[in-house]
Design a protein with these regions (language model features):
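Non-heme Fe(II) oxygenase catalytic core, chiefly the N-lobe of the double-stranded beta-helix
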Residues: 2-249
Length: 249
């Protein structure tokens, strides 16, 4: 008698009330139907952080899995690409800059939103761990939609119409930046990219706090130093344990 292997059933389980969901029972190296793809997409949008368990990717398989969530965006730093896959970048403390020194790319231990200096920043960031340190190396994510809603009304009213001027690396961080990135900044054409400090989600209509302290040159109407002080205070107000999830790979 032949016994057919059971097909795993994809399950999506919430991790915390305000953020995070865990996905099991799906292999993204294999084709999936549109209903499954849509469930994954909606879970990512609605839960902010989506943990998809038990995956094993080559760089190309990883890029194909990422395409399930939308069109891919090239990383602005083209120096540290995965072998044979131009749409996948590596974050590693083994990377070297053009002078042969350890590249300053690994210690991203500040709250930020990726690529705010781009006209069309990405909707999602996708991470896959290949090699881990003995300790540390987790990734923290915060639901800045719920964090925004929890702000005092007067602070929400104050930031609703604020706009930020964004560059590849802000002036106040020039002294700690990767020299190759600094050179890219100096050679960049055009002025800073202007974005709202509070963005409205195009599909859900929800508002969220949205900025990158390392790329925000200033809030329009403020000086750079005043901007950094204000953003630090805003993060202090917004980042709460109930809105945050730290993923340990």
């Amino acid at each position: 008698m032949n016994v057919l292997a059971k097909t795993p059933v994809m399950r999506i389980t919430k991790i915390k009330d305000h953020i995070g969901a865990e996905v099991t029972g799906v292999d993204l190296t294999k084709p999936i139907d549109e209903e499954t793809r849509q469930r994954l997409y909606d879970a990512a949008v609605d839960n902010v952080a989506l943990v998809i368990r038990d995956q094993k990717f080559t760089p190309t398989q990883y890029a194909n899995a990422a395409r399930l969530f939308g069109e891919l965006m090239e990383d602005q730093n083209r120096r540290y690409l995965a072998p044979g896959e131009p749409m996948v970048s590596t974050l590693s403390n083994h990377n070297k800059d053009s002078k042969g020194n350890q590249a300053k790319v690994a210690k991203a231990a500040t709250w930020h939103t990726d690529h705010t200096n781009q006209e069309f920043p990405p909707k999602f960031t996708m991470l896959y761990a290949v090699e881990l340190p003995d300790s540390g190396g987790g990734t923290g994510v915060c639901n800045m939609r719920d964090a925004y809603e929890a702000l005092p009304d007067d602070l929400k009213a104050r930031i609703d119409d604020m706009k930020t001027a964004n560059t590849l690396i802000s002036t106040v961080r020039m002294d700690i930046g990767n020299p190759d990135v600094l050179r890219d900044q100096q050679n960049a054409e055009g002025g800073p990219m202007i974005h709202p400090l509070v963005r409205t989600h195009p599909e859900r209509g929800t508002k969220a706090i949205w900025f990158h302290t390392g790329k925000t040159e200033k809030i329009l109407g403020m000086e750079p130093k005043e901007t950094q002080e204000f953003l630090a205070e805003l993060l202090e107000e917004a980042i709460k344990p109930e809105f945050s999830y730290v993923h340990e790979y």
